[in-house]
C-alpha cells in the first residue's frame, strides 16, 4: 500500500475517534451542566419573585404613611419593573432550554450511533479495497514473471483500482472533516441564537430602566428635604438646621450613597460609614456630641465600628479640649498599614487630625489631613502641632507675640531643660491666681540658678478662669505671663552659667592600645 494512502487512512480514523471520544462526551456533559443551570435559574427566579413581592408590600406600607408616600410609590414601581424583567428573562431561559439543550441532547444520542457506523463502514471499505488492490498487484507481478499475454490488461486493471482507492481515501477524509465541522458549527449557531436572545432582552431592559432610574433618583433626592407636612415646631427654627436640636446622632439611612470611587480604597472603606459620608446637616448635628469610644487593645474593623456608634453626653471633644475641636499632630516618622487595612499610612511631616480624644493602649485614631484616609497609628510616631494660643481676655483673637510659626519666637535647640524638674509651661499651666504664679516664678528665678529653660514650643494658654474671678485678675495675670515668656524667648539663659558646669575641670587621659591583648595569628 502506498504511504500517502496509509497517511490518509490514519487521518480519517483520527477524526472519527475525536468525534466519538471527545466531542460527543463533551456535548453530553454540556447538556448535563445546562440542565443544572436551568434548575439554578428557576430557583433564582422564584427567590427573586419572593424578594420583590416583599419589597412591594413594604412600598404599600409606605403608601399608607403620611411622610413616605413618594418613597412607597418608588418601591412599588421598582418591584413591578424587576418582576417584569424577571418574566422577560424566563423567555430567554425557555429559548435556552428548547432551542439549545433539547437539540443538543437529541443530536448527541443520534450522532453517537451515526459516527460509529460511519467509522466502521469506512474501515471495512478501506480494507476491502486495499485487499483487492493488493491481490491484483500480486497477480500482475506473477503474470509479468511468466510473460503472460494478459499482463497488459491486468496492469490497466491495477492502475484503475489504484486510482479508485486514492479517490476513495481522499473523499472519505473530506467527509470526516465535514462531519467534524458540522458539529462545531451546530454548537456555535445554537449559542449565537442564545446570545441574540440575551441581546434583545438587555435592550428591552435598558429601555425600560433608563428613564425610570433617573426619575426614581430625582424623587428620592427630593424626599431628603423636610416635608411640608411637618410643623415648624418639630423641625426647630425656620432658618435653623433641618434636624431638630435634640437630635445628636443622624441615622445612617439619611446619608447619601457612597461614591463609586471609594470602593477601591481599603483605607477609605474601613474609615467611612456603611452608607457613605454624612451630609452637611447631619454633620453639624453630630459635632454637638462626638464619640466616647471604648477600644480594644489592638485596632480592628469591629472596634472602629463600635467606636463610631457609642455616644456619651458627659464626655465630648468640646469639654476635653475647651471647644477647640479635634487636635492635630505631625508625623515624626513614616507609618505603613501593612496587611492590616485599619491602620493609617502616612509619611514623615504629614499632619493628622486626631479623632479619638485619648490614646488607647498607645494607639490613636485619626484622619490624614488633605485626604479621606483614616485609621489607627502609634502615639509615639507623632508630636502635637504648635497651636496659636488664645488671649484670655479675648478668646477670639490670638496672641501675635506667641505665634509658633514665627522664626523669631522659636527657641534654639539647646533650650530643652537638663536638670530642672519644672518648666515655664508647668508654671503657666498651674491653676489658681495668675499673680501668685508670677510671684512664684520671680522668687524661683532669684533664688536658683537658671539651669532650666522653657521648652521649644510654648504650650497653649491656660483655660479661662470662672467668670467671677476672670473679671478681677484676668488681665493682670495674662499680661505678666506674656511678659515673662517674651523675656525668656528674646534672652534665653546660658546653658551652663559660669561656675556651674560640672564637667569644666574634667581632663581626659590619652588612651594607649595594649597590643598584647590581641589574638595570636599564625
Swiss-Prot record:
One of its GO terms (molecular function) is identical protein binding. The lineage of its organism: Eukaryota, Metazoa, Chordata, Craniata, Vertebrata. One of its GO terms (biological process) is membrane organization. This is BAR/IMD domain-containing adapter protein 2-like 2. Expressed in the epithelial layer of the intestine and in the kidney. It comes from Mus musculus (Mouse). Phosphoinositides-binding protein that induces the formation of planar or gently curved membrane structures. Binds to phosphoinositides, including to phosphatidylinositol 4,5-bisphosphate (PtdIns(4,5)P2) headgroups. There seems to be no clear preference for a specific phosphoinositide. It is a peripheral membrane protein. Residues 457-466 have a biased composition (Pro residues). The modification Phosphoserine is found at residues 231, 272, 303, 472, 475.
Amino acid at each position: 500500500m502506498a504511504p500517502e494512502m496509509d497517511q490518509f487512512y490514519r487521518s480519517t480514523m483520527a477524526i472519527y475517534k475525536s468525534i466519538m471520544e471527545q466531542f460527543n462526551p463533551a456535548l453530553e456533559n454540556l447538556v448535563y451542566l445546562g440542565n443544572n443551570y436551568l434548575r439554578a435559574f428557576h430557583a433564582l427566579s422564584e427567590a427573586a419573585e419572593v424578594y420583590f413581592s416583599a419589597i412591594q408590600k413594604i412600598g404599600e406600607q409606605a403608601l399608607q404613611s403620611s411622610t413616605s408616600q413618594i418613597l412607597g410609590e418608588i418601591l412599588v414601581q421598582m418591584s413591578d419593573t424587576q418582576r417584569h424583567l424577571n418574566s422577560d428573562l424566563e423567555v430567554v431561559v425557555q429559548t435556552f432550554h428548547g432551542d439549545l439543550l433539547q437539540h443538543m441532547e437529541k443530536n448527541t444520542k443520534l450522532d453517537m450511533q451515526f459516527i460509529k457506523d460511519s467509522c466502521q463502514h469506512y474501515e471495512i471499505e478501506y480494507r476491502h479495497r486495499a485487499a483487492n488492490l493488493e491481490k491484483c498487484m500480486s497477480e500482475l507481478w506473477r503474470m509479468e514473471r511468466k510473460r503472460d499475454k494478459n499482463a497488459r490488461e491486468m496492469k490497466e486493471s491495477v492502475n484503475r483500482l489504484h486510482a479508485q482507492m486514492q479517490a476513495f481515501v481522499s473523499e472519505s477524509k473530506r467527509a470526516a472533516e465535514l462531519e467534524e465541522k458540522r458539529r462545531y458549527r451546530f454548537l456555535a449557531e445554537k449559542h449565537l441564537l442564545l446570545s441574540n436572545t440575551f441581546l434583545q432582552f438587555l435592550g428591552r431592559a435598558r429601555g425600560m430602566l433608563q428613564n425610570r432610574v433617573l426619575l426614581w433618583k430625582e424623587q428620592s433626592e427630593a424626599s431628603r428635604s423636610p416635608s411640608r407636612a411637618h410643623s415648624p415646631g418639630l423641625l426647630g427654627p425656620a432658618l435653623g438646621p433641618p434636624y431638630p436640636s435634640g437630635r445628636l446622632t443622624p441615622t445612617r439611612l439619611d446619608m447619601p450613597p457612597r461614591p463609586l470611587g471609594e470602593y477601591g480604597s481599603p483605607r477609605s472603606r474601613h474609615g467611612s460609614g456603611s452608607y457613605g459620608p454624612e451630609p452637611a446637616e447631619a454633620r453639624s448635628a453630630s459635632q454637638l456630641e462626638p464619640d466616647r469610644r471604648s477600644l480594644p487593645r489592638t485596632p480592628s474593623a469591629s472596634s472602629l465600628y463600635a467606636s463610631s456608634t457609642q455616644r456619651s453626653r458627659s464626655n465630648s471633644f468640646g469639654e476635653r479640649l475647651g471647644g477647640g475641636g479635634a487636635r492635630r499632630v505631625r508625623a515624626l516618622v513614616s507609618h505603613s498599614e501593612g496587611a492590616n487595612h485599619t491602620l493609617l499610612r502616612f509619611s514623615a511631616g504629614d499632619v493628622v487630625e486626631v479623632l479619638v480624644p485619648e490614646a488607647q493602649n498607645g494607639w490613636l485614631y485619626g484622619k490624614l489631613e488633605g485626604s479621606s484616609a483614616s485609621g489607627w497609628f502609634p502615639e509615639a510616631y507623632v508630636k502635637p502641632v504648635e497651636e496659636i494660643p488664645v488671649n484670655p481676655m479675648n478668646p477670639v483673637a490670638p496672641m501675635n507675640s506667641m505665634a509658633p510659626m514665627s522664626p523669631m519666637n522659636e527657641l534654639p535647640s539647646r533650650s530643652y531643660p537638663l536638670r530642672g524638674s519644672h518648666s515655664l509651661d508647668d508654671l503657666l499651666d498651674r491653676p489658681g491666681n495668675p499673680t501668685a504664679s508670677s510671684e512664684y516664678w520671680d522668687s524661683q528665678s532669684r533664688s536658683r540658678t537658671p539651669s532650666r529653660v522653657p521648652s521649644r514650643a510654648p504650650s497653649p494658654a491656660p483655660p479661662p478662669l470662672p467668670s467671677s474671678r476672670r473679671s478681677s485678675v484676668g488681665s493682670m495675670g495674662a499680661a505678666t505671663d506674656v511678659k515673662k515668656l517674651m523675656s525668656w524667648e528674646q534672652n534665653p539663659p546660658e546653658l551652663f552659667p559660669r561656675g556651674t558646669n560640672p564637667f569644666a575641670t574634667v581632663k581626659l587621659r590619652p588612651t594607649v592600645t595594649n597590643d598584647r591583648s590581641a589574638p595570636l595569628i599564625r
